[in-house]
Amino acid sequence: MGHDADDPMAEGEVGRVGVSISNVEDMKVLFDGIPLDDVSTSMTINATAPMLLAMYVVVAEESGADVSRLRGTVQNDILKEYAARGTYVYPPAPSVRFAMDLCAYCAEHVPRWNTISVSGYHIREAGATAVQEVAFTLADAIAYVEAARDRGIDLEVFASRLSFFFDAHSDLFEEVAKLRAARRMWARIVRERFGIESPRAQMLRFHTQTAGVSLTAQQPELNVVRVTLQALAAVLGGTQSLHTNSRDEALALPTEESATIALRTQQVIAEESGVASVVDPLGGSYYVEWLTDSIEAEVEGELSKIDELGGATAAIEKGHYQKAIARSAYKEQKAIEEGRRVVVGVNRYAADEPARMEILRVDPSILEEKRASLTRLRASRDARAVDESLRRLAEAAERGDPTMPPLIACARARATLGEMSRAVERAFGRYRPAGSLW
């Protein structure tokens, strides 16, 4: 959201929602002793992805690493923020341009970096159906490829560096079919819509995470079973990497014990079940093939609607995604409340006594430590250099010039995330959605 750790808007978030990074010095602590040109780093960050990558580049430079050899992934998928997650800062159109600034910079200076991970996960967690998850994700990916084309970025290189992020929900066969449909649809889109013949560019490289929204606070031990089935669906659907949620995440951040069980779940599937030894093991099943075809046809229909609206960005600006997701979420919740959709331990087979489980409690002193650290940073840096770097950043954003070089200059001067975000906001404005979801 572009807030520093000492911003009142960040209170309650620090230490609970990812790693708190407000400046280059925070990033240095995080990667202390790690040779950045020998590892691959993944950052789940979107609206402020260019700022975080700029800090990462400066840490690499100052540690003596070769920036051209840096490897990793930044999510940088801003479109889904307007439809699902909500951590946007600027309006959609300039935000896509900002994301492309990062992509263009990496294409020239950090060629081994995966610049966008197009995320259906958050869309599904917000209440979308499996069909909507695939359709909106592919539509967003199309919008990014079109933006890269307009920017003059080599499309074969750009598409080869795209990755995807999907949800693994509880309907095993639907999830397998969904992933199979997405894979062949993306290959066809890249080949037919954009004329890219490279097999690598046509690959649907994707990560999957089990469905956090399916976890229950009631009888949380049952979440181990849910996660196992969802993980199995992801593997059967061909995921290349996987995150399994922990049993207690409906209650709090996971304990070490819960996270270990989640990891062991993956290891049992990988090492004991044999399902990972076969490519597309359910291919040829009458039901799976029929369901894959059905999902693909429905997704094609959704993509046609989005094209008619002018593409993903226009569809989001018109509220199409948001309304569709809200309606689907309402239908699902109503089905649960009426008992038509069974959730074991919640609306059927409920326990008489509430669950008792040890949960992780975050030390509140973390926030005070972060605030003190920022105070020391602001007192020790060259204020004039910071102001000058922020002025140049705002001017670049206003003129439509590439923003990565001035962002890197800001990071070198020890400007904070919040300061950089506000400088860009002066040019782009802040997005405030209007209108009803219904």
Named regions from a protein language model:
Residues 1-169, 174, 193, 200-207, ...:
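Catalytic alpha/beta active-site cores
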Residues 3-4, 79, 252-253, 325, ...:
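Short Asp/Glu-rich motifs
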Residues 15-22, 41-52, 62, 87-98, ...:
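Catalytic cores of large soluble enzymes that bind and process phosphate-bearing ligands
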Residues 25, 53-54, 184-185, 226, ...:
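A generic alpha-helix surface/boundary motif
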Residues 32-36, 58-66, 100-112, 140-153, ...:
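Generic secondary-structure signature for well-ordered alpha-helical cores
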Residues 119, 135-144, 160-345:
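Active-site capping/gating regions of soluble enzymes
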Residues 256, 264-267, 271-438:
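Flexible, glycine-rich loop/tail regions that form catalytic "lids" or insertion modules at the edges
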